Amino acid sequence: MRILFLTDNFPPEVNAPASRTFEHCREWVKAGHQVTVITGAPNFPTGKVFPGYRNRLWQRETLDGIQVVRVWTYITANTEVAKRTLDFLSFMVFGFLAGLVQRRPDVIIGTSPQFFTNCAAWMLSVFRWRPFIFELRDLWPESIKTVGAMRDSVALRLMERLERFLYRRSAAVVAVTESFRRNLIARGINGDQIVVITNGVDLSRFQPMPRDPELAEQLRLTGKFVAGYIGTH
């Protein structure tokens, strides 16, 4: 199968979308699929392009068998909403154009946030006559409103309408939590269209370690049951 994946972030960037996308694509390559990722020059979160890269109109490289196409975007730090929106829109445009000249895929995947990436993926699915899958890692723009980055406005309501449009136009929505699935169903999205695939872990890299008595003593945890949680969901 030929898979075309659009993502705003990809290694060497280190964040949730970059890691999740890379690990999934790497496993698909191991399974014998041909994977092409369209992304931008690595710059997150500072807005400065990583050493060894340039913000060019077109760059190609191969990472662990994944064909990576990097396109020009309006680069800015992860701070001002207006500038970040320009960044998102520029990737939507140039990511779409890059997708038009790739070998025709069997499936097109866009990951969100931000969902302008999925706008490009949906448009490509229309022009290339291929199914579009919406990967939902966070509820956007709801999360923007929740953290106070945007107030309720005409612009926000238009974004919410676009969000629902993309859900309905996708062949499937892949959500990372059951709560996201319930949220979409409550908003009128067909539950049969939604698949939950939670974030996983590479057990070849992460294994339980034997208890460290000296560390437990230092932290005054000797004889106590200790549980830790790392994550946002």
Name each region found by the language model.
Residues 8, 73-83, 126-161, 204:
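Acceptor-binding helix/loop patch of EC 2.4 sugar-transfer enzymes
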